[in-house]
Amino acid sequence: MTTLADLRINYSRASLDEADVAPDPFAQFDRWFKEALAAKLPEPNTMTLATVGENGRPSARIVLIKGVDERGFVFFTNYESRKGRDLAAHPYAALLFYWIELERQVRIEGRIEKTSTDESDRYFASRPLGSRIGAWASEQSAVIDSRATLEAREKAVAERYGENPPRPPQWGGYRVVPDAIEFWQGRPSRLHDRLLYTRDAAAAPDWTISRLSP
């Protein structure tokens, strides 16, 4: 019988060398993300978001990246959810993209800022109607007594707003403004390639690339 200790694979698809990466981590992320899309990976925009609450306890969950540019990495959520409360208490976060089919990870750390009202409005308006209604119906992370309660709220919101629900005031975007981005490429014998981009401040233009021991 296979045990947990027996489960392992040997990584051998590719390598990651300093001479081959972009000097800017956003350009390198764009390169890898396009390769994930070309490989037709299921939902390559999924990432783990790690936060820390007011009590010092960490928590993590899967969310979807919805924007990347030189300012940072953007996702949207309910500001009153657990992650929203965590980020209000400690405005720093870590992100992790894991593309196992390509034997790659991207790890991102940085401070958090809310996106502008206009940016949140534009993205909310682009969502499917059901998702916009759901943003009103769900008091994310709050305890509810039954599924029926949630569905009743959904029906009430749909009847109230019809085809044009506005963005709820408690719903919007966050941007992770990174000061560290690590690119990880699996290699044989667990001697993986790890290249870390860092900068002294989140707004600094220049990045330093360091190789980390696996």
Swiss-Prot record:
<feature type="binding site">
    <location>
        <position position="105"/>
    </location>
    <ligand>
        <name>FMN</name>
    </ligand>
</feature>
<feature type="binding site">
    <location>
        <begin position="76"/>
        <end position="77"/>
    </location>
    <ligand>
        <name>FMN</name>
    </ligand>
</feature>
<dbReference type="InterPro" id="IPR000659">
    <property type="entry name" value="Pyridox_Oxase"/>
</dbReference>
<feature type="binding site">
    <location>
        <position position="127"/>
    </location>
    <ligand>
        <name>substrate</name>
    </ligand>
</feature>
<comment type="pathway">
    <text>Cofactor metabolism; pyridoxal 5'-phosphate salvage; pyridoxal 5'-phosphate from pyridoxine 5'-phosphate: step 1/1.</text>
</comment>
<dbReference type="GO" id="GO:0004733">
    <property type="term" value="F:pyridoxamine phosphate oxidase activity"/>
</dbReference>
<dbReference type="InterPro" id="IPR019740">
    <property type="entry name" value="Pyridox_Oxase_CS"/>
</dbReference>
<feature type="binding site">
    <location>
        <begin position="8"/>
        <end position="11"/>
    </location>
    <ligand>
        <name>substrate</name>
    </ligand>
</feature>
<protein>
    <recommendedName>
        <fullName>Pyridoxine/pyridoxamine 5'-phosphate oxidase</fullName>
        <ecNumber>1.4.3.5</ecNumber>
    </recommendedName>
</protein>
<comment type="similarity">
    <text>Belongs to the pyridoxamine 5'-phosphate oxidase family.</text>
</comment>
<feature type="binding site">
    <location>
        <begin position="190"/>
        <end position="192"/>
    </location>
    <ligand>
        <name>substrate</name>
    </ligand>
</feature>
<comment type="subunit">
    <text>Homodimer.</text>
</comment>
<dbReference type="Pfam" id="PF10590">
    <property type="entry name" value="PNP_phzG_C"/>
</dbReference>
<dbReference type="Pfam" id="PF01243">
    <property type="entry name" value="PNPOx_N"/>
</dbReference>
<keyword id="KW-0285">Flavoprotein</keyword>
<dbReference type="InterPro" id="IPR011576">
    <property type="entry name" value="Pyridox_Oxase_N"/>
</dbReference>
<feature type="binding site">
    <location>
        <position position="184"/>
    </location>
    <ligand>
        <name>FMN</name>
    </ligand>
</feature>
<feature type="binding site">
    <location>
        <position position="66"/>
    </location>
    <ligand>
        <name>substrate</name>
    </ligand>
</feature>
<keyword id="KW-0288">FMN</keyword>
<keyword id="KW-0560">Oxidoreductase</keyword>
<dbReference type="GO" id="GO:0008615">
    <property type="term" value="P:pyridoxine biosynthetic process"/>
</dbReference>
<feature type="binding site">
    <location>
        <position position="131"/>
    </location>
    <ligand>
        <name>substrate</name>
    </ligand>
</feature>
<feature type="binding site">
    <location>
        <position position="83"/>
    </location>
    <ligand>
        <name>FMN</name>
    </ligand>
</feature>
<feature type="binding site">
    <location>
        <begin position="140"/>
        <end position="141"/>
    </location>
    <ligand>
        <name>FMN</name>
    </ligand>
</feature>
<feature type="binding site">
    <location>
        <position position="82"/>
    </location>
    <ligand>
        <name>FMN</name>
    </ligand>
</feature>
<comment type="pathway">
    <text>Cofactor metabolism; pyridoxal 5'-phosphate salvage; pyridoxal 5'-phosphate from pyridoxamine 5'-phosphate: step 1/1.</text>
</comment>
<dbReference type="InterPro" id="IPR019576">
    <property type="entry name" value="Pyridoxamine_oxidase_dimer_C"/>
</dbReference>
<dbReference type="InterPro" id="IPR012349">
    <property type="entry name" value="Split_barrel_FMN-bd"/>
</dbReference>
<feature type="binding site">
    <location>
        <position position="123"/>
    </location>
    <ligand>
        <name>substrate</name>
    </ligand>
</feature>
<feature type="binding site">
    <location>
        <begin position="61"/>
        <end position="66"/>
    </location>
    <ligand>
        <name>FMN</name>
    </ligand>
</feature>
<comment type="function">
    <text>Catalyzes the oxidation of either pyridoxine 5'-phosphate (PNP) or pyridoxamine 5'-phosphate (PMP) into pyridoxal 5'-phosphate (PLP).</text>
</comment>
<dbReference type="GO" id="GO:0010181">
    <property type="term" value="F:FMN binding"/>
</dbReference>
<feature type="binding site">
    <location>
        <position position="194"/>
    </location>
    <ligand>
        <name>FMN</name>
    </ligand>
</feature>
<keyword id="KW-0664">Pyridoxine biosynthesis</keyword>
